Amino acid sequence: MIPKTKAEGVPDFVLLNQITENAFIENLTMRHKSDNIYTYIGDVVISTNPFKNLNIYKESDIKAYNGRYKYEMPPHIYALANDAYRSMRQSQENQCVIISGESGAGKTEASKKIMQFLTFVSSNQSPNGERISKMLLDSNPLLEAFGNAKTLRNDNSSRFGKYMEMQFNAVGSPIGGKITNYLLEKSRVVGRTQGERSFHIFYQMLKGLSQSKLNELGLTPNAPAYEYLKKSGCFDVSTIDDSGEFKIIVKAMETLGLKESDQNSIWRILAAILHIGNITFAEAAEQRTGTTTVKVSDTKSLAAAASCLKTDQQSLSIALCYRSISTGVGKRCSVISVPMDCNQAAYSRDALAKALYERLFNWLVSKINTIINCTTEKGPVIGILDIYGFEVFQNNSFEQLNINFCNEKLQQLFIELTLKSEQEEYVREGIEWKNIEYFNNKPICELIEKKPIGLISLLDEACLIAKSTDQTFLDSICKQFEKNPHLQSYVVSKDRSIGDTCFRLKHYAGDVTYDVRGFLDKNKDTLFGDLISSMQSSSDPLVQGLFPPTRPEDSKKRPETAGSQFRNAMNALITTLLACSPHYVRCIKSNDNKQAGVIDEDRVRHQVRYLGLLENVRVRRAGFAGRIEYTRFYNRYKMLCKKTWPSFNGTAKQATELILQQHNIDKEEIRMGKTKVFIRNPTTLFYFEEKRELEMPRIVTLIQKTWRGYRARSKWNQRKAAIKIQLFYRSYRYKKWFRELHRAFKDVARDPQWGKQVFWPKHPSILDRAVQLTHKIHNCWRAEKMILSLGAGQNHMRQKVMAYDIFHGKKKWDFRRHFDADYLEKPSNPNQQKYVLAMQNLFSTYGDTEVLFADYVIKVNPKGVPQRRGIVVTGTNIYKHDPKNYKVKKWGTPLVDVTSISISPMADTFLVLHCKAPQRDFVLDLGCNGYEAVSEITTVIVQQVLKLTGVKLSVQFTSSITYNNARPKGSDTILTFAPINNDPKLIGSQFKKGKGNQATIQFKD
């Protein structure tokens, strides 16, 4: 933080060798000329406007300041923003940044830089953070377009006050925000000082909208064509690209979720305001009554305004030229229409334009708040106050009084928190202190706002009296404050520099003369009911919404004046700021000509004086950078001392002393008050924070370990208890259900249908699996009973039905032949006895219990040679026998390993059984015995596999079959079928090995 050269000055005014005004100005000048526009007074940032772009706001600069302490880096507004963000995260308390200074000092830019920093460092804390940050940032250009204007002192002057709050969650990610606006200078819409502009949005709209859209709104891009814009004679500003800014605004509207219909309504309202400004009036004689009335002389502008507002042209014309007045009360109440003169009509026209713009601006702020507001979570906020600076013009009116009153309130807050309250706290805590004098502006604030005798109260009183004028109001304040040293007038002081319609206030920033002409009208802020009714009849939902119906209970109330509204808003703002931990930015305007690199010492000196910066330096230098309550200090830093960690039985003050002693803090560096410890140098606070940050990971690990152990033990015990309870409960429910089931199926064994019509009792969901198993057991038992009850004829019929289902329409089969199953057990088999003995041996060896099919077949071996074999299909396996001795060839093939069956649709007698590896496929000829047996073995295998697995085998009928009855992979054989009717030697079907992997079945068709 120490400057590189003496020419750069000291980075903190507290470090000056001499605390004098000249030394202060000299240091400020040196730093400004070396482009070091930021300087500290302790925690306060002093910012001078360089009137040029500086390369100190890059993303790399934000990263450099993020998470660093002030003393580690050169002075910067990012350092203050980082302090606010860190304080918010550490304490979970609301923070606010109060930016003050006169118009053109750089307050708006300062607020944008703070927002830029906060959104960047916080948006990566959660997925939603970046979206919220972008919406908060995009609200800035939108509000600037509608709320800022070019003035003589500032090309981008805020003509409204704004307090923007960013809300964060516990981890520091933005979750929402809120914008509160104060006193929009709506009079700027209809008039302003020569050389100034109206609000930016009018010029941006005219240059940014397409020609077709302008034509639709009845507009021309030529700004001087509109009375409201040409009055001041300023249309373009060299530092503002109106066309480019308009594109940014439209993009911001889209980001914030403003629908296209809303955008179109906004352009129509703005266009209507410009058309309203072009409406002129002329007097006309009323022949019937002989009186003079007023009428709209420019009907073209009237029609354009009515079209944009989507309201009736005639009703708008009447509302501008006539005023409805209620007479009498109750049943005698009547409404009469009173014509206005040209001046009154012009006043009514301007009032409508101002009301439209102000209500549109308030709607826009409300719309943004609806979009960015967070209602689901609560968390600390960081508020940024960007409000108009102190203003002194050649002609100062009601608006300047309110603006300067606002600055007086903020100066009073600064004095209360940094000068007055700080010194009072030292005395209250028993700290030795030499009092430092400062200018207290409290009497001026009371002069303006005090009730019942204050400028605002007297102005409200004048507005209540029908015959009051601006002059009678001036007379009343001159009389009331005749002896008040802070208010002067020509009547009281005979000072000829004060006009006879003016009074002068001695503000903290200097004397300002106010002209009372227009004070009453501006305070009343009257908009006649006829115009409100005309707007309420609009078919545009937005225009209607800007003028909501008056509630019956509100219609009897006297409307609050503009002055009272602003006073109440200011008091509410001060209450909000007092509830936050403040951070200050004091902006100084380097010169009035907006020249880069130039510093006007006289102008700067004046600002330094009225801002009380020198007194701030003296208090800061003589005082203490930090003060913390003993309890809070102990709770935050107790882990830094063995004697206070993890708990301490003494007082918080004693614990604080022990912590300071262990770290050898110099006695001159601290003072022990009655309830707080005072620390002189901020580096001491930073030292404790750094030590705490180093210690926290160890403590967090310890807490996590302890908590995880406790949680794991608790969960384990809970789980054991839960399992035990579940077991007992399930056992109870299962037993109860089984008792009900037993009663339901009591006589099921004697039931002819074995319980088919019995209703199963309802069961709880926890028994789903058990009930499924019980159902399965019952179904198996019932199926067994049904099968055992079937006669041989019934089973044979079932097989025929299945065979029909498989073969019908796909291959000819002998449906008349009886399925005898075991053909080898018949007496016709010459080796019957050998077969029977072989089957007995097979059953005892392999555990099979029944034969479903047995017959002689021709089996094709892996070499492609047909061999005569006996094939036996049992309840679980397929066996191959040598027909000579009936020995099992190799091993049996499980039926569940059969994956599909392939058969040709022709007249041959072959079939292929496809099996899972490592089993080989079977290629069988079942026609060697003189009868068709393909249908029987196919039906038997399909039926038994369905019984074993619940899956019906796929039977494919195809004229080309690929099979593999050899071990190696890739040794597939393609089998085709060829009918041959001219070979007398061919009997039945024959297998012919072809070349390569080809083979053919020859048969007589």
From Swiss-Prot:
Residue span, Myosin motor domain: 8-693
Region (Disordered): 539-562
Region of interest (Actin-binding), ranges: 556-630
GO MF term (any one): ATP binding
SUPFAM superfamilies the UniProt entry points to: P-loop containing nucleoside triphosphate hydrolases
Residue ranges constituting the TH1 domain according to the UniProt record: 810-1004
Residues in IQ domain copies: 694-722, 716-745
Pfam families noted in UniProt: IQ, Myosin_head, Myosin_TH1
GO cellular component: actin cytoskeleton; actin wave; cell leading edge; cytoplasm; cytosol; early phagosome; leading edge membrane; macropinocytic cup
Subunit structure: Myosin I heavy chain is single-headed. Dimer of a heavy and a light chain. Inability to self-assemble into filaments.
Protein name: Myosin IE heavy chain
